[in-house]
Amino acid sequence: MDLNKCIGCQTCTVACKTQWTNRNGREYMYWNNVETYPGTGYPKNWMELGGGFDAAGDLQAGIVPNIEADYGVPWDYNHDELQFGAQLKPNVEPTWGPNWDEDEGTGDFPNDNYFFYIPRICNHCTNPGCLSACPRDAIFKREQDGVVLVDLDRCQGYRYCIAGCPYKKIYFNPKISKSEKCILCFPRIEKGLPPACAQQCVGRIRFVGFLDDEEGQVYKLVHKYKVALPLRSDYGTQPNVYYVPPTEAPPKFDAEGRVIPGSDRIPTEELEKLFGPEVHKAMQTLRAEKEKRRATGKSELMDILIAYKHEDMFRLDQNYYQSIAKKQGISLAPIDNRYMAGKNTENKYKFKVVEYD
């Protein structure tokens, strides 16, 4: 994900929400969300809720966020009552919700204020904290592509997975008392199509492919040029979503409103907190390649990031998935109630539903 091109339009969020999480106990979930940084994020203060692994590789204790206080309870607009009913004084004050602090920057305007957007999905980690925390072995990582999924037949809703995930990108469905998460739109990628969030991104910030595909743009951004970095790699989960750090902020102004040449409006210590010490080299490479493009008109890296052709951003070989399915004797993306939350749950699930006030 190229953070220099994200405009915070939430089209990716809407694409995911309308496809996966607008019904059946998932209403409060945002498998994809776009956060304003610096900000509290979603769920609230997720970076402070624990989980992940320490330097010795031991799973760290984490906190399960509260649905109402930390995620925000979704609502339906009562359009008919508002439009045709009696005029009443509102008696409910909103207290929290996704993107509560959207577009709220920090610093002093206009000298050094800033913010930028961070789109977040499940990182489909190589060493998932959610998987390690689950006592039911209900979370598994697919061998063919590394997608991390929840087996809803095995899940008992203990929520250890939520505590174990340092990114808090796995959620509890109170309707079926089970945990659910981003599935990277695997029915789409098995057909050679990108996830809905990536397909609908108007800023063309999302590249999707295999890390070992040396001809792919993901490989070139992560391994060849090393300008795409994982978010909070210090959590020890080896996340597989990579970010090109923001370098396009204007310089700072001094007290008289004059430009301070060479100044960074976004503090480098904040970027290092998010993306680790390698962010300095990544930013140097990005700036050097940009100058190279200006001077010579040529830069493979800049061409990749500009993303002239939408289809070039996604390298998902349908034939690969078909060969795997044939070898294993399975059908691709079967219609399976395990991935249809709330469907026929009256007979399928016998677990207690947690009620929230």
Identify the function of each model-found stretch.
Residues M1-D357:
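Non-ligating segments of multi-cofactor redox enzymes
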